[in-house]
Amino acid sequence: MTVRTPAAATARPLHLLLCGALALWLAGCQSVPKAIAPTATPEQVVAGWPARRAQLQARAQFTAQGRIGVVAGADGFNGRVRWVQDGARSTVSLDGPLGVGGVRIVNDATGLTLTTPSGEALDSQAAHDELVKRMGFEPPLDSLRYWVQGVPDPASPGSETPDAQGYLGSLAQSGWTVTISAYMQTQDGALPQKLTVARGDVRVRLIIETWHSP
């Protein structure tokens, strides 16, 4: 499935917030922390990539926090995002511009649940419909848990292209294109700092500010 960020305290067309949200998003990009230079040579990264990819695909727990900007056709919004992975359970918290509104999405083996800014809890088809309504498209949640870490979803075939440093630079998978423009050094090695997920007229940009794992 795919993810959608809250546009306001109540669901309403995202185009009402497009201009202001994108202006805030562009302004906020100026204060993004600089990526740390990689500690391994490109040759070392390429040689170790199969093992590194398998390690990240099997990674059971992590937390990523940062900013999200979405354009879906003529609509768009930006906000804060917090992704918590615990085994097969993904919990995504999204806050709209200036902290207005908040949506909590949980995706696991039992299905999808969504809590609206008003506290209403939805599940199954109702949660899916609300998610698509708020996002403007159906986000690939099952794959995003891997893409955000800079690796392909092991459940689907994909085409990988390395960057100049030997890390994953772009990925074509399940009709989506993932482009990673910057990495940052963390306690778990190099992980994406800036990435874009796109398909058709949908573009999701993520700027990860902090990574954490137990």
Predicted feature locations:
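Bacterial N-terminal signal peptides that target proteins for export
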Residues: 2-18
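A short, Trp-centered hydrophobic/proline-enriched beta-strand micro-motif
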Residues: 52-74
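Short beta-strand segments that buttress and anchor functional surface loops
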Residues: 66-70, 81, 92-94, 169-172, ...
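Gly/Pro-enriched, hydrophobic low-complexity segments
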Residues: 150-214
